[in-house]
């Protein structure tokens, strides 16, 4: 248990940040799932539009520190390749 006032404050702050970060990661996952759903349906135009919406969310996660830069780049690259393969 936290003994000092500062430690108690850090616990409160960490709980708030965890909630915000969790929501941010969930939002990123939702955008990526929309791209994957469009890919599964075979709709290249919808997939391209969904990827254009997902890209800023992915890289916003990088700038906010909830997703590693390489992870975001890898996800974006793989989705782009899958869209290109639809031809």
UniProtKB/Swiss-Prot annotation:
Single GO biological process annotation from the record: translation
Statement: the UniProt record of this protein carries the keyword rRNA-binding: yes
Molecular function per GO: small ribosomal subunit rRNA binding; structural constituent of ribosome
SUPFAM superfamilies associated with the record: Ribosomal protein S20 (SSF46992)
Domain of life, source organism: Bacteria
Cysteines engaged in disulfide bonds, as pairs: none
InterPro entries: Ribosomal_bS20, Ribosomal_bS20_sf
Pfam families reported for this sequence: Ribosomal_S20p
This protein's UniProt keywords: Ribonucleoprotein, Ribosomal protein, RNA-binding, rRNA-binding
Gene3D superfamilies attached to this UniProt entry: Ribosomal protein S20
Function: Binds directly to 16S ribosomal RNA.
Membership in a protein family: Belongs to the bacterial ribosomal protein bS20 family.
The protein's name: Small ribosomal subunit protein bS20
């Amino acid at each position: 248990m936290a003994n000092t006032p500062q430690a108690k404050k850090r616990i409160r702050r960490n709980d708030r940040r965890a909630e915000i970060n969790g929501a941010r990661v969930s939002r990123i996952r939702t955008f990526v799932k929309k791209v994957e759903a469009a890919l599964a349906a075979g709709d290249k135009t919808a997939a391209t539009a969904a990827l254009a919406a997902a890209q800023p969310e992915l890289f916003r996660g990088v700038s906010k520190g909830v997703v590693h830069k390489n992870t975001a780049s890898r996800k974006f690259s793989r989705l782009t390749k899958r869209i290109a393969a639809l031809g």
